[in-house]
Amino acid sequence: MAGRRAQTGSAPPRPAAPHPRPASRAFPQHCRPRDAERPPSPRSPLMPGCELPVGTCPDMCPAAERAQREREHRLHRLEVVPGCRQDPPRADPQRAVKEYSRPAAGKPRPPPSQLRPPSVLLATVRYLAGEVAESADIARAEVASFVADRLRAVLLDLALQGAGDAEAAVVLEAALATLLTVVARLGPDAARGPADPVLLQAQVQEGFGSLRRCYARGAGPHPRQPAFQGLFLLYNLGSVEALHEVLQLPAALRACPPLRKALAVDAAFREGNAARLFRLLQTLPYLPSCAVQCHVGHARREALARFARAFSTPKGQTLPLGFMVNLLALDGLREARDLCQAHGLPLDGEERVVFLRGRYVEEGLPPASTCKVLVESKLRGRTLEEVVMAEEEDEGTDRPGSPA
């Protein structure tokens, strides 16, 4: 008996395996940056007990790097002297921008002369938004790839020096806004170009993480915080995690118009209320429209699926395409026809769609949209530089008295 008790006691019951947590729809695994890949925050020291320096480089690209890349034929065509026919091409100090170089373990930190101070970093972001992002003679995918790389270098320079939270936030805000605009401008064929949409999405998420950690440290003021907290929610529309994080913000901050509208958009998206959702999307300024653009195709597909369930009959029921154009903020009848045909719905002439039972299908990703109505038209003559550097989203709105 005692032997049996000892044998039984030596084998305690094996604990049940923990259930895996489901991944949030707006945070796919490939877009969650691992801690080892995240750039350090602007105030985090790379080595304990070391005081971070302040950069002293006055140029967008240090002279030593310009000379090295010139010798090695590693200058981008956006960085060479216009019309230069030399071999190798000569770097233009007014156009060359420091490229991103991943910090290696054991490698000494760059000296202050190789780091750009926050004022130069902000001027660099302004240049990227105003001159490079607006380039009309270069494919948008190539522009996005160049801008994204140079913005990574901006954030790394910021992380390697002792910048204050207020000035760091201004640089992070401008960099993130620039990245959102160039990503939104990518066309349907961007996946075949030099810009990788998955990597760009991960970089946007990292940008939001760095900026929101800067806000969370409490040192301010941060006048654009309501707008950028709203951008975070719009970019992660439908994410339970993102909504939870926003709802943890102080009530005074959540009461600001940019965040109130972002919360309303998120609620309409969750409820599947297409009419309310697209009415709200049409009222958003340009930058929030860039942030939410990645969800427009899925929202339109969900709305079309609801139409198919409601209107489909064995003999077919028709609906004017003009109704869909207005309800879903499409760019015209042609886009409405393309949307219906991409989901297996036949057309009756040029202006009506037929909902036949069993014909609606979903294959692959929703068709890409130019989003002229929902995004491009909202520039209203403004340049990207003006949108990125100005407080467009906060104009005429109340700001929280104390976000702490």
UniProtKB/Swiss-Prot annotation:
The gene is SAC3D1. It is found in: Cytoplasm, Cytoskeleton, Microtubule organizing center, Centrosome; Cytoplasm, Cytoskeleton, Spindle. This is SAC3 domain-containing protein 1. The lineage of its organism: Eukaryota, Metazoa, Chordata, Craniata, Vertebrata. Pfam families: SAC3_GANP. GO terms for cellular component: centrosome; cytoplasm; nucleus; protein-containing complex; spindle. Residues 203-379 form the PCI domain. The keyword Ribosomal protein does not apply. GO terms for biological process: cell division; centrosome duplication; spindle assembly. It comes from the Eukaryota. Keywords: Cell cycle, Cell division, Cytoplasm, Cytoskeleton, Mitosis, Phosphoprotein. Residues 87-101 have a biased composition (Basic and acidic residues).
